[in-house]
From Swiss-Prot:
GO terms for cellular component: cytoplasm. GO terms for molecular function: acyl binding; acyl carrier activity. InterPro entries: ACP, ACP-like_sf, PP-bd_ACP. It comes from Rickettsia bellii (strain OSU 85-389). It comes from the Bacteria. Belongs to the acyl carrier protein (ACP) family. NCBIfam families: acyl_carrier (TIGR00517), PRK00982.1-2 (NF002148), PRK00982.1-4 (NF002150). Pathway: Lipid metabolism; fatty acid biosynthesis. Keywords: Cytoplasm, Fatty acid biosynthesis, Fatty acid metabolism, Lipid biosynthesis, Lipid metabolism, Phosphopantetheine, Phosphoprotein. Its main location: cytoplasm. This is Acyl carrier protein. Residues 2-80 form the Carrier domain.
Length: 81
């Protein structure tokens, strides 16, 4: 399994756990608000968990640009040390 696949799987698991969904229900194409029904509080919780899991800092101005699951995966790939 590649590093990217591993990041993607972890991100999907975090979102699924937060939203009470099955992992199979989440894909990188989905949008947080429109497709998954993630509200602003849940978005903050998800981003805090992402920061903790991957050791990355996601400033608020960057977090507001994240609209899809793929955006999270790409952000981690770009900023993970």
């Amino acid at each position: 399994m590649s590093k990217v696949d591993n990041i993607e799987q972890k991100v999907i698991k975090i979102i699924a756990d937060n939203q009470g969904k099955k992992i199979e229900e989440i894909s990188v194409d989905l949008r947080f608000a429109e497709d998954l029904g993630v509200d602003s509080l849940s978005t903050v919780e998800i981003m805090m968990e992402i920061e903790k899991e991957f050791g990355v800092d996601v400033p608020d101005e960057e977090a507001t640009k994240i609209k899809k699951v793929a955006d999270v995966v790409n952000y981690i790939k770009e900023h993970k040390s």
